[in-house]
């Protein structure tokens, strides 16, 4: 049986991690091998790169440096976690992947989408997620949720304009490829969001069997 690669995307405070855990629980109840992972990160080396990316520092990080670090972490993550899990037939649930790069570095930072696409092909080859869930909510709601968690990381310290661009980039990608994306209203109560997530499980099982 081939594996299934599902990514969960969205801006700050959208509840990706909570819903990833919920989806994993529901899939494991059906006897499936589920791997939970995240980006940036997912391996010891990639997690160290994550710290560089998220920790505020005195030295400003050049946008090209940020982009290359993201893909360096991704290359390690793919080699050590994602590809092996898919090869054994697991369902991989990943909190962020390359759509986040298009949204944050492309939309938020304004980097060339062509440059991102070149790195995507170099690092990933033809590997793309089978299904991407975008947890969408108003920027001010997401930032308020992020602030309530405590100290903000380097990205969470960006302003409204940055995150409006991130949100717009996500929705544009979903509109451009509706067969791969499902947009979930993350501004609802958690139980309503989880009902929407659970409603997608039959589709996931069909994709897994294809």
UniProtKB/Swiss-Prot annotation:
InterPro entries, alphabetized: P-loop_NTPase, Thymidylate_kin-like_dom, Thymidylate_kinase
EC code(s) of this entry: 2.7.4.9
Residues reported in the UniProt entry to bind ATP: 10-17
Cell membrane keyword on record: no
Listed GO MF terms: ATP binding; dTMP kinase activity
Entry keywords, A to Z: ATP-binding, Kinase, Nucleotide biosynthesis, Nucleotide-binding, Transferase
GO BP field: dTDP biosynthetic process; dTTP biosynthetic process; dUDP biosynthetic process
Catalytic reaction(s) noted: dTMP + ATP = dTDP + ADP
Functional description taken from the UniProt entry: Phosphorylation of dTMP to form dTDP in both de novo and salvage pathways of dTTP synthesis.
PANTHER family: THYMIDYLATE KINASE (PTHR10344), UMP-CMP KINASE 2, MITOCHONDRIAL (PTHR10344:SF4)
Assigned protein family: Belongs to the thymidylate kinase family.
The protein's name in its UniProt record: Thymidylate kinase
Gene coding for it: tmk
